[in-house]
Amino acid sequence: MISQILMIFTLISIWLSLAWGLVILISAVQFWLKHSDFRVDTSPLLYYPKVTIVVPAHNEDVVIAQTAKAILDMNYPHDRVELLLFADNCSDRTYEECLAVKALPEYAGRDVTIIDRTGTGGKAGVLNDALKMATGDYICVYDADAMPEKNALYFLVKEVLKDPERHVASFGRNKTRNANQNFLTRCINQEIVVTQRVHHVGMWNLFKIGRIPGTNFI
C-alpha cells in the first residue's frame, strides 16, 4: 500500500514538474516574441555614475589577469571606475598577478586597489569588506574567472538609470568562457544558457521575479 502511494506521488511530482517547465517555456517564448524588435543602443548616457567593481579571487592566478584586463578595458569612462581586486587567502600567485596588471603602462593612473586579504567569510566576507571601502555610487561584482564584454558595465548602468528610484539592481546574462573546449564545457554552457534565457526570462515574464546571479550585476 505504501509503495503504491509513493509511486503515485512520484508520478504526480514528475508530471507537475514537466507541466511547470512547459509553462515557463511558453512564457519565455512569449517574452522573446514580444521583444523581437529589440535593437541594441549604445548611445552615450547623459550621466555616468561612478562604479566600484569588486572582484573576489581565491587562488585564481590562472585567470585573474585576463579578468582584470577585461574589466579595465570596458567601454565606460575610466575616471568613473574604481576596481577593487581581493586576493582572498591565496596560496598561489593571485596577488602578484594583480600587481602585474596594475603596473602595465596602459593602466597607469587607473583607480585600482589590490587587497591581500586574510580575513574569514569567503566571498561574502570580501563583499562586506568592499562595501566599507567602495567610493562609487554603485557596486558591481564580477567573479575572478569572468571576462565581461566591452559594453557589459554600460548596459548594467543604463538599465538602472532608467528609473533609479525603483531599480536598485541590474544584472546581465552569463555564458561559459571556454564553451567550445570540450563536451563537458559545452554541456555546462548549455545549462547556463537555458537557465538564463528560458527559466529566468519565463519567471520574469510571469511574475516579474528576477534572480541576481553571483557575477555581472550592480
Describe every region a protein language model picked out.
Residues 1-47:
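N-terminal membrane-anchoring/stem segments of glycan-assembly enzymes
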Residues 30, 102, 106-109, 116-132, ...:
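Long helical/loop segments within the catalytic core of UDP-sugar-dependent glycosyltransferases
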Residues 49-52, 82:
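Cell-envelope/extracellular polymer assembly enzymes that use nucleotide-activated donors
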Residues 65, 92-101, 151:
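Acidic helix N-cap motif at the loop->helix transition within catalytic regions
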Residues 69-80:
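Short, acidic, metal-binding catalytic loop of nucleotide-sugar glycosyltransferases
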Residues 78, 87-96, 119-120:
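A conserved acidic beta->alpha catalytic loop
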Residues 139:
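Short aromatic/hydrophobic "clamp" motif used to bind/position activated sugar donors
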Residues 143-147:
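The conserved acidic donor/metal-binding loop of glycosyltransferases
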